[in-house]
Every structure is written in structure tokens, then in C-alpha cells.
């Protein structure tokens, strides 16, 4: 798991070969020009989804992991929390779905990560995470970039 500002994402280009493509896309497009909905960047290797919602989750309601992709959760407006935990703190509630690349769990929160505008959380397959944990009553605008691991 990596917690950083979007302005420092370039620091992590060696982590995944698709990060350089994402940085190039963001430099050419600009965060302020992202519109709601799906974002096609590089086929099934790198794509995103931009959306606005009221964070309504209670920490620990569920956790998720992915096997084929990592997530970059980037808050564009307002703030939200992400609950994170370790494998020994959860039990599986939905077995891994290969088509959707998700496995769901319930369990105990280990930490809350507070994300503000311009900050992002990068989650890897071993990182159990729960997005959309409410901080306040204002809408959150966020983009989640989905990045192929290999």
C-alpha cells in the first residue's frame, strides 16, 4: 500500500510499468478535465472511472482485494477515509470472482487512511481496503485508476 499525493506519483514509476502511461495521460489531460464515467487509457491494462458520491460507508462494513489489478484511489474534491486491515483480521464473505477481479471480506479495521483532495491510496493484491468511508456530509469526487499488475 502506498499513500501519496498525485504530484508525487512519478516517484513510483518503477513499481509498475503502467504508471508512466498514467502519468503521461494525466499530464496531457489534466485532473480538472476528467469527466464522470469510464476512462479508457490503455485498454484492459490501464483504465479508470471518475464519479461523485456521498461517502456512506461505516469503517469495517466490508473489505475488498483484487488479484489481477491494483487500484489507485485519487480524491479530486472533498475528502474520504479508506479503512484498511490485515488478512488475519478478516473472513471471506464472497469468494474471489475472476471476472470482476474482487474478493470480499468482513472484519476488524486496523487503520483509517484520511484522503484529501489531490491525495491517493495505491492498493496492491495483499492490501485489504474499504473505500467510501464517510468523513463529512459533502459529495466526494474521485477517480479510481485500475492498473494491470503484469
Language-model features: where?
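Surface/interface-facing alpha-helical segments and adjacent flexible terminal/loop regions used
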Residues: 1-35, 40-42
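A short beta-loop-beta micro-motif enriched in histidine and acidic residues
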Residues: 43, 59-71, 88-92, 108-109
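Short histidine-centered beta-strand/loop micro-motifs
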Residues: 58-66, 73, 84-85, 113, ...
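Glycine- and acidic-residue-biased ligand/ion/polar-headgroup-sensing regions
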Residues: 68-70, 74-84, 88-89, 96-102
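A short hydrophobic beta-strand segment most commonly corresponding to one strand
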Residues: 72, 120-122, 137-150
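Conserved metal-binding segment of the jelly-roll/cupin
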Residues: 114-132
